């Protein structure tokens, strides 16, 4: 009888140890995946949130809500990564290109903040609206600090043509997402300043970036950052129209012309972009294309008000952009998920 009890007791102890081991294994697995979330994944979710706003404007609000929920979960996970793995994050942040892409985190927070303010207002949930507003202002402030540090470090203290890449625009012009999303924040003076700053920094940096791309070879790991050229001019178009209503026709026309040229460049380069085996840098294709849609939609509305016959053409171009961008964002999201969850190819 005692021997049977000992045997049963031993089996229970072994089973308990195995259960504890399994739990610890899962915890370590989840922590490992959390730590290894690549920085470009932030830009991909930024594109998803932007694209969901486009679909929301077309009437697909459920899809928008789903994307905003997924984006919220992702941002929380990434903030946990920053808190739990500061050494990993600082190592990423110390490298110029990943550092420039970290600005996408605050850009996501601006979009989410404006969304929750909208939801809180529409559904009569004041607390949610207040939270949204706080998140938005914190995101703008953090982005501003990051921007000042980035400019001081990479434009004045250290200058390296090899690390001067279009990804810089994520930091330099990314703060203009505040102008895209901040209409309900009662912060017009701030938005005016950001719009003027964004247009000026784009005009200053564009020839530098073009010269760099034409004269210095781009390494494969940064190849897809070339597509980011579409983002700053698109942000300028949207910001000018959002903030000023009827901006100077020459200024907004120039910015949109730059956006169209950048879009054509991306479309021509698509075969080259997809000649690479997938890696997180593919995310460089996503947000620029998504904000490019918003720029075309805003420009179509601007031209309609001006009575221009080009409005219909620009509106149709936006349709093509929605098609291309949806495919690109979906592809990058799926492939990033496969990398994160280590799904191998099947023969």
Where are these regions (language model features)?
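C-terminal transmembrane-bundle signature of multipass membrane proteins
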Residues: 47-53, 71-81, 209-212, 235-347
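A generic, well-ordered mixed alpha/beta core segment in the N-terminal half of proteins
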Residues: 114-154
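Juxtamembrane helix-loop boundaries in multi-pass membrane proteins
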Residues: 27-52, 87-114, 132, 136, ...
């Amino acid at each position: 009888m005692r021997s049977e009890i000992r045997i049963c007791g031993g089996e229970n102890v072994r089973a308990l140890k195995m259960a504890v081991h399994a739990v610890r294994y899962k915890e370590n697995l989840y922590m490992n995946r959390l730590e290894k979330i690549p920085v470009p994944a932030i830009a991909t979710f930024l594109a998803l949130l932007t694209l969901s706003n486009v679909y929301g404007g077309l009437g697909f609000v459920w899809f928008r809500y789903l994307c905003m929920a997924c984006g919220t979960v992702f941002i929380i996970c990434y903030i946990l990564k920053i808190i739990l793995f500061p050494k990993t994050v600082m190592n990423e942040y110390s490298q110029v290109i990943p550092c420039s892409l970290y600005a996408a985190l605050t850009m996501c927070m601006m979009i989410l903040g404006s969304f929750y303010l909208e939801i809180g207002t529409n559904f009569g949930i004041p607390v949610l609206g207040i939270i949204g507003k706080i998140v938005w202002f914190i995101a703008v402030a953090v982005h501003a600090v990051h921007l000042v540090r980035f400019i001081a470090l990479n434009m004045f203290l250290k200058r390296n043509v090899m690390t001067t890449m279009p990804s810089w625009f994520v930091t330099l012009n990314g703060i203009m997402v505040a102008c895209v999303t901040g209409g309900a924040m009662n912060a017009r003076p701030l938005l005016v300043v950001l719009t003027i700053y964004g247009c000026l920094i784009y005009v200053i940096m564009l020839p530098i970036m073009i010269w760099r791309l034409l004269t210095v070879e781009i390494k494969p790991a940064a190849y897809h950052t070339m597509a980011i050229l579409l983002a700053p001019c698109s942000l300028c178009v949207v910001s000018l129209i959002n903030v000023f209503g009827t901006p100077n026709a020459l200024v907004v026309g120039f910015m949109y012309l730059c956006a169209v040229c950048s879009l054509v460049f991306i479309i021509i380069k698509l075969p080259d972009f997809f000649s690479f085996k997938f890696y997180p840098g593919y995310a460089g294709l996503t947000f620029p294309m998504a904000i490019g849609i918003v720029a075309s939609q805003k420009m179509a509305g601007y031209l309609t008000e001006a009575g221009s016959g080009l409005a219909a053409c620009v509106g149709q171009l936006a349709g093509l952009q929605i098609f291309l961008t949806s495919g690109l964002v979906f592809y990058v999201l799926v492939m990033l998920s496969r990398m994160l969850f280590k799904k191998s190819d099947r023969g």
